[in-house]
Amino acid sequence: MQSYEPLLRAFSENHINYLIVGGVAVNLHGYPRFTNDLDILLTLDQENLKKMAELMDRMGYQQRLPVSIQELSDEQKARGFIEEKGLTAYSFIHDKYPQFNVDVLVAQSIDFEKFSKHTMRAEVWNIDVPVVSIDDLIAMKKNSDREKDIQDIVALLELKGL
């Protein structure tokens, strides 16, 4: 695996309901920068999470946490993981390709419907992929105080002409 291409193709072929966010979304909006993972939002219904878990397993990814991703389909449980355990992302790691980790942002996934209303579509490797809107991406990054997120906000605002 040389890129996220096989993963994005598999998401499409398996009808995973997701949105690309984070650094990859920044790139897809037109600001090239390095990122070492793929951040996504998922609909947290049981069927989508089951498909995701099975797909990631088939592709050689392991769940990083001692709980199944399917447990996030219970919104009360998901909020408990966030508030009591400090869970921000549910991570999948690949032993052979550690540079291609996948993080499911949990709190934002709870609000998937809100973010999906403004989705943009991008073509990557001849795959139609859903990407969070530039405005929603800026709003997500405003909740972080990491230097790279601040730089992303500046770059995204410049892309918008602001």
PLM regions: where:
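Compositionally biased terminal segments of proteins
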Residues: 1-162
